[in-house]
């Protein structure tokens, strides 16, 4: 328990939620006890699973054990999100985290990982490759375990759980509220945790007759501004500053409802301008824009939008972004779901203005609690606000943003999002403490890296003029402190001699050393850089930095700081960047230099400006001391002296000081207190002012004093002397006198201090007080600090805001950065040292969730939407830290709807049932079990089925036994198995993870094929179950389709065949580069559906290719089609498409310009660069092993 709580504290979690406490109390940490957690959304289910994982994977010392854990999620996107979240949390303890969501026909080696994040289908496919590491798994967490009820996917999850039950593993099931949790828990032999606690109050109600009737009896009248109920509900919420989600039963209804919700009259002029920009962006995604794009753009202009699977990823992302910014006020959906121009964003080469970012570099973003480089970002311009907010922190950071830009704030131990206009002085905002990069080692020793660092700082490598190297490499140093290069092979190999000139020593090196530096891409003078070393492992990078500071760095005892000087701005910026990897903070300033006159010829020489990097806060100096192995004896001595400073030694362990004046206040329980900053000011001006104040206090010992101009004692900074005086206004004059505390303090100082102007002496006297002068009790002493340990949180430092102000702006635009919505990041970027929202986040906070439809069309006609699904929809209302409450509203059109709505809001959700009797599930799963040897005869089969959830629920296996016998007969008749032994075909189909019936369709089609036509192969894959549902065929299309099919030798013309052939025609257009908009219009589909069909087609074409090899029907056409389907391109550019960084657009450009093969690219690098740009060309050539512009490093 202590280990768990200690690790949770590392994440800032100091108190568990009620369901989490209940799980621990019931024995969650018993490794042999399964659990089923059935609680509402956002109640903390995931953390319960994490506690179980921690318990298995980390020992008492927080080190990895030899066990593995699996975290199963329902969707790939969620898997990516959890992967990044868990990496950021647990890699610090040495846990290796893996994400496994790739191709099903892929045998990944996951044996070296401790925690594997995956989907049920991917784990099932891995199992079929007979993974050995499964024996090391001791805990499995299943998120959304209620999906065992899903018609198509539930059977796979049930089979997996049945297998896992036979292993010695702890199973933790995380579920939404379901109707029969006890039944599922009993099958799992699990402790059941049921709780209805929510972090934000959810008000549930029914809308009917222009009023919301809440379940708690409250009634809210809704003003009818239109005859549309949804419009009235939305307007009522929007007027109060809220946003709405409207859940519809179909994509078409979502679109139609969004079109009706015209909210223009409730939009400000600024919002209208910004929505117009967003609408234009929507229209720019596809060229030319589709009808759906145009409809969505029109809705956005009105403040509404629709959101469903038919939209492309880019469209959905833009809608989510605008809703998150509260520009779009309402989204109608199906039940799925700005910065100043001078702002500097942290990239891999350092901080750059947002308007000048390098497109080829990643930006640093928050990923969980770690700050890492993220690719796939974009910059967007938005109209500037009439005013901006300037935020300054205690630690000296400053940023200017639009009023609605979102900051991450810590309040009372919990995280909140706040817009800039809502921030206040004293708030703790997230700033960067350290950054993390993907490390890349170089074959250089620590000694060589130290040598290189020293040479970059104080070395001269000569110059190249007209391709000729002039001068020799030279390293200057103080002979009193010669550099220690004993462990440097580079020094030993290329050293020539040592000479001393005018008291300065010089090491002279061979010109060959310059060539080595050139290969490392290090330039000379003001262009020096350390590009090649920025991503070194920290233990090696430390030696390079040590060399830099031992040569051009300075340790100042009097200032108590560290500085580095260089005329190379780039070098100093890169140094600032790499220091952040150690959590070492620094600032950069430019120091102007004067013109020098030569004493020999009298000529004036303009000196280059010097860039100074300064490390001044104690934590950074301490980290520098602990991580950077300086070899310069004098510098090391000074650094040690700073660290061992007597005053620093007085700081208690629970605090870390930022400044070096340790005692800032003395106080007693009786109420006596003295702010000592009055006696130890930080500036000369403050010192003079405070002398006047203290002199006044001594004068007041004699009694009341008339002050004619008290402003000379006043400062905009703290005025601690006000604690000791009373000011009265009599007849327009200001009279001062000491209060009781003032009389005690000044009497004490008057008695013990001789020099009444010596503030230092007064300070030392008060610091050494042990007992209170009023009551005699012990004196407490408080440090002058601003950094506390609790302010450090992963890679975040919570800095306190010291100033906020509004400023008018003249800029036309503000800027946003969009980060990829792939689970790789937390949608916060590093800007001016702050961690601010990238304004394109994932969450869709809403005040009111509205369920418009209670029914939807199924294969059995119109049916009520399950209560569990409705409760999940309304559970979206009310986000912690964002809404004071949430409202889940169901619209009742009649009395029947009212009754159903009441049931949905008050009754338990429906029970979940096993879907194992589904023949499609049984075909795939039984073949998999036989192929892996888990079932070898009828007895194994019966024993396995009796352990399933199906058997637990129904007891009688007669119905499922009938289906099982039919499936076994099918597998035998089609030669997938023989006497419960898999054939080669059966094994391969199991590994390919397709339905055996789909494999039969493919085999039959290949054997009946008369002509090898591309369209025929596409027809074969379109007939598979994995491609269902196919495109709808209209009566007017049937005859033409039959004629085309007949010409290919296809003799079956059932409606399913016609639909498969129409789908094949769509895929054929795709691979022949027909414009996307034309495909969408021709086949009456949406962009998202096209993407889905293409992804599945790539998978099934791969399966067809593999099956064709086994049955002797191999051909190169399927292999080419697999690539062409992936890229949507013609055959002539396939070779080019096989190269990383080349998509169909670049491939077509290269091909049309005569670059048609890999050999052409290698032989014509300049031409390639002129066609697609030098940066991309360099990446492509590097991928092909050809260096562009530089040679490989070799000694």
From Swiss-Prot:
<dbReference type="InterPro" id="IPR050474">
    <property type="entry name" value="Hel308_SKI2-like"/>
</dbReference>
<dbReference type="InterPro" id="IPR004860">
    <property type="entry name" value="LAGLIDADG_dom"/>
</dbReference>
<dbReference type="GO" id="GO:0006314">
    <property type="term" value="P:intron homing"/>
</dbReference>
<dbReference type="InterPro" id="IPR003586">
    <property type="entry name" value="Hint_dom_C"/>
</dbReference>
<dbReference type="InterPro" id="IPR027417">
    <property type="entry name" value="P-loop_NTPase"/>
</dbReference>
<feature type="domain" description="Helicase ATP-binding">
    <location>
        <begin position="26"/>
        <end position="196"/>
    </location>
</feature>
<dbReference type="GO" id="GO:0016539">
    <property type="term" value="P:intein-mediated protein splicing"/>
</dbReference>
<keyword id="KW-0540">Nuclease</keyword>
<dbReference type="InterPro" id="IPR014001">
    <property type="entry name" value="Helicase_ATP-bd"/>
</dbReference>
<dbReference type="InterPro" id="IPR006141">
    <property type="entry name" value="Intein_N"/>
</dbReference>
<dbReference type="InterPro" id="IPR048772">
    <property type="entry name" value="Hel308-like_dom4"/>
</dbReference>
<keyword id="KW-0238">DNA-binding</keyword>
<feature type="short sequence motif" description="DEAH box">
    <location>
        <begin position="143"/>
        <end position="146"/>
    </location>
</feature>
<dbReference type="InterPro" id="IPR036390">
    <property type="entry name" value="WH_DNA-bd_sf"/>
</dbReference>
<dbReference type="Pfam" id="PF14528">
    <property type="entry name" value="LAGLIDADG_3"/>
</dbReference>
<keyword id="KW-0067">ATP-binding</keyword>
<keyword id="KW-0068">Autocatalytic cleavage</keyword>
<feature type="binding site">
    <location>
        <position position="20"/>
    </location>
    <ligand>
        <name>ATP</name>
    </ligand>
</feature>
<dbReference type="GO" id="GO:0005524">
    <property type="term" value="F:ATP binding"/>
</dbReference>
<keyword id="KW-0404">Intron homing</keyword>
<dbReference type="Pfam" id="PF21280">
    <property type="entry name" value="Helicase_dom4_arc"/>
</dbReference>
<keyword id="KW-0347">Helicase</keyword>
<keyword id="KW-0651">Protein splicing</keyword>
<dbReference type="InterPro" id="IPR011545">
    <property type="entry name" value="DEAD/DEAH_box_helicase_dom"/>
</dbReference>
<dbReference type="InterPro" id="IPR030934">
    <property type="entry name" value="Intein_C"/>
</dbReference>
<keyword id="KW-0255">Endonuclease</keyword>
<dbReference type="GO" id="GO:0016887">
    <property type="term" value="F:ATP hydrolysis activity"/>
</dbReference>
<dbReference type="GO" id="GO:0004519">
    <property type="term" value="F:endonuclease activity"/>
</dbReference>
<keyword id="KW-0413">Isomerase</keyword>
<feature type="domain" description="DOD-type homing endonuclease">
    <location>
        <begin position="451"/>
        <end position="584"/>
    </location>
</feature>
<feature type="binding site">
    <location>
        <begin position="39"/>
        <end position="46"/>
    </location>
    <ligand>
        <name>ATP</name>
    </ligand>
</feature>
<dbReference type="GO" id="GO:0043138">
    <property type="term" value="F:3'-5' DNA helicase activity"/>
</dbReference>
<dbReference type="GO" id="GO:0003677">
    <property type="term" value="F:DNA binding"/>
</dbReference>
<comment type="function">
    <text>DNA-dependent ATPase and 3'-5' DNA helicase that may be involved in repair of stalled replication forks.</text>
</comment>
<dbReference type="InterPro" id="IPR006142">
    <property type="entry name" value="INTEIN"/>
</dbReference>
<comment type="subunit">
    <text>Monomer.</text>
</comment>
<dbReference type="Pfam" id="PF00270">
    <property type="entry name" value="DEAD"/>
</dbReference>
<dbReference type="InterPro" id="IPR003587">
    <property type="entry name" value="Hint_dom_N"/>
</dbReference>
<dbReference type="InterPro" id="IPR022965">
    <property type="entry name" value="Helicase_Hel308"/>
</dbReference>
<dbReference type="GO" id="GO:0006281">
    <property type="term" value="P:DNA repair"/>
</dbReference>
<keyword id="KW-0547">Nucleotide-binding</keyword>
<comment type="similarity">
    <text>Belongs to the helicase family. Hel308 subfamily.</text>
</comment>
